[in-house]
Amino acid sequence: MMSLLTGTGLRWMWLAVFAIVLDQAAKLAIMQHIPYGHGVVITPFFNLVHVYNTGAAFSFLADAEGWQRWLFSGLAIVISGVLAVAMAKAPAKCSLSNLAYSLVIGGAIGNLIDRVVYGHVVDFLDFHWQDLYHFAAFNVADMAISCGAVFIILDGFIKKPADK
């Protein structure tokens, strides 16, 4: 059992746990200090806001009738499971892929917790250009998923030594 945690990609799972804790702590702070629908101006291009997203990225399917909550929850569980199995089969030294998978798992579980507990995801990071364009509000879990996805793509471009 210990070799599974130290000799495989699962040794990187600490990063998923860190992403989950950071995400949930940030969301809790936002929910306690900023009323829903309100925000705090931090810089001319960045606000902290308290908004809900019942859909996925960019509020995809947010207007659906509630079934999307369970669809996205199921996807998060399946994807996290598949990536955890891949990490268990990978050597610990495959650092970029294991790093990427851990970030995706952490982000997926962070948003899964919101969907199960609240019925929606709490978003709070709001970047904008003047008042002309607001990027969709997002959270720490979304950042972890996005960074993980970028690392997965980068890992695909890295030449691997042939198996002998």
UniProtKB/Swiss-Prot annotation:
One of its GO terms (biological process) is proteolysis. GO terms for molecular function: aspartic-type endopeptidase activity. It catalyses: Release of signal peptides from bacterial membrane prolipoproteins. Hydrolyzes -Xaa-Yaa-Zaa-|-(S,diacylglyceryl)Cys-, in which Xaa is hydrophobic (preferably Leu), and Yaa (Ala or Ser) and Zaa (Gly or Ala) have small, neutral side chains. Pathway: Protein modification; lipoprotein biosynthesis (signal peptide cleavage). GO terms for cellular component: plasma membrane. The active site is at D123, D142. Its EC number is 3.4.23.36. It is a multi-pass membrane protein. It holds the Pfam family Peptidase_A8. The chain crosses the membrane at residues 2-22, 40-60, 70-90, 99-119, 138-158. InterPro entries: Peptidase_A8 (IPR001872). It comes from the Bacteria. Its main location: membrane. Belongs to the peptidase A8 family. This protein specifically catalyzes the removal of signal peptides from prolipoproteins. This is Lipoprotein signal peptidase. The lineage of its organism: Bacteria, Pseudomonadati, Pseudomonadota, Gammaproteobacteria, Aeromonadales.
